[in-house]
């Protein structure tokens, strides 16, 4: 019980997770800056090399290699080892593969490899250069997980693997994404930096201008590459290599021969085909994957009159034909994860190779000196051969012979051992010459090795020579094309939309849809799908290339391209705006709908209950970035109770404003200033404290009507309201009563020509064209009344009009609209 310690769970968890984080950072996910390998990759290469599973020998079952690696060096799941081995064999993931594999090792389509019991593997030839000289005490070794064997903590790496093959991985708090590069270019940059240790980044980039992906493609953005090489972080555009191919009959097809690095080809083809299926861009007939053993090929066949460049631009922008590659060059440097630039990577590699060459030279020198000592002894033996033979024959045994040689002729222990084990056939004249030549060679070698160890310039010359040998043997052309500037993809969205005729309908409650002419013509107008408590306020024929603007009572405007509206049957209710517009309020209603071809020209006038008025330009309503999810303001309301009464296009006529208490004011529309969307406007009419605006409309006829809440209706001449100025009180159009006073419910122009466009929202039902302008009134008890407005006689300005029925005064008006 004395070993029990009381510790807080917080401290224990923090300390243990810290250990775990350090382990996975250093021992799992991040590469070493010197050899560019993660621990599992290093163990795979070392174990296969140790077992003799190298390129000059036959292939060996992958399962055997995986078992040896797992049993001796990597005590984790066999799948993690096999997956790492497979990745090192995939030529679309690595610029230079380190493992050669027979059998199915996966594909660019994301297909899994065959099980390890079916595949065979061996080290590639270039992988041998990563392990070169490892037996010469060139790198530190550490005990394996069970202290039964030692493994290298880094490989000698005769070429800069970190840059050549790149790396990617995620650990606790760190991630790395280092792109692959061209072997020749990397070696050229290393050689230049050996000669110029303080070389500028600009100069190094003359030799190493950018990444070189195994899948090719086009890399755009020289400035971002420079930034990444300087700081370790940056982002470049990687674009597929494409060409337009002519077909018979004047048709074309887009051919893709190279795709961005680490893009799944099958998923890419599926996404391109989804564009075709969903008709997101018209003109694609078929998408085919024609890849075979000769190379990658994706064919996108187009219709005869299709705009191939526009379609290609769309696919580049909205599929993985073009992607962004994010540099995040993090590597383990002196047991610490660091974000490193190009100069740091190259200098760390040069420093590592310096240590390797010096340690190798020391090892070779010691070996040469040991051999020279033996050779010197053997040459001396041959000069006194008869005496030596006699001495050996007189000795009792091998040990006695060795002792006699050391005492009588002053041979060392090593020389004595070599003499007594010397085979008789070597005691010939030819062997003497051979030994003398070997002695000379050994002395020259020792001199050379001493120079390498003692003279830095000589050592660097060796380093450069060895790098150039690797380049000469394994150099291959650059696969990725570099372009200095990232091209901005411009898409003519109008050309992407198939122009079709359609009918657009909008209800006051916010339901909208588009309907094909076939469905619309197959039904009557009354059969429109809507809620019982809703009202259809807009139906109009339009083209899918046009735009819909919806203005609400709360001063918001909603934009929708016609082609984005849900295509439904005429009898369907439609899509409610709250499904997509996050700020569409429960009490908000659609006041006015307008279909426009462009936003270049046009003015609107908005009038609020508080009597404020403004004009604003349609240009300001051009689509905003978040139009799919949010509306934007077209007028600022004075308070929470304020509402927009009228919104309509502006014509160069007078405006007539009528208040609930019966005041009417007429003034020129030119008096209303054009203001920005967020302004509240200017005072249109001078309201009394208990009054508010009921209606506003443009004066386009000689008369107008006034309907009160009690159901009284009259028609009066526009001239009875003479033109004055904005912000006045106006004239009364009702006679004040002490009991049951009349209040204006609705007012509007009476059109003598019913085909003329009406600019009051409440009278704007363009879908119904009748011979007469009708006023429909629904009472609170559900009674419906229809009155032909032109049949009404003109009344005096101060009269209260006539009731539309004997009982309407008691029922009162619930809804009124013109059609």
Curated annotation (Swiss-Prot):
It is found in: Cell membrane. It catalyses: ATP-dependent breakage, passage and rejoining of double-stranded DNA. GO terms for molecular function: ATP binding; DNA binding; DNA negative supercoiling activity. Residues 30-496 form the Topo IIA-type catalytic domain. It comes from the Bacteria. One of its GO terms (cellular component) is DNA topoisomerase type II (double strand cut, ATP-hydrolyzing) complex. It is an enzyme of class 5 (isomerase). SMART domains: TOP4c. One of its GO terms (biological process) is DNA topological change. The record marks 38, 74, 76, 87, 93 as: Interaction with DNA. It is a peripheral membrane protein. Belongs to the type II topoisomerase GyrA/ParC subunit family. ParC type 2 subfamily. Heterotetramer composed of ParC and ParE. Topoisomerase IV is essential for chromosome segregation. It relaxes supercoiled DNA. Performs the decatenation events required during the replication of a circular DNA molecule. This is DNA topoisomerase 4 subunit A. It comes from Streptococcus pyogenes serotype M18 (strain MGAS8232).
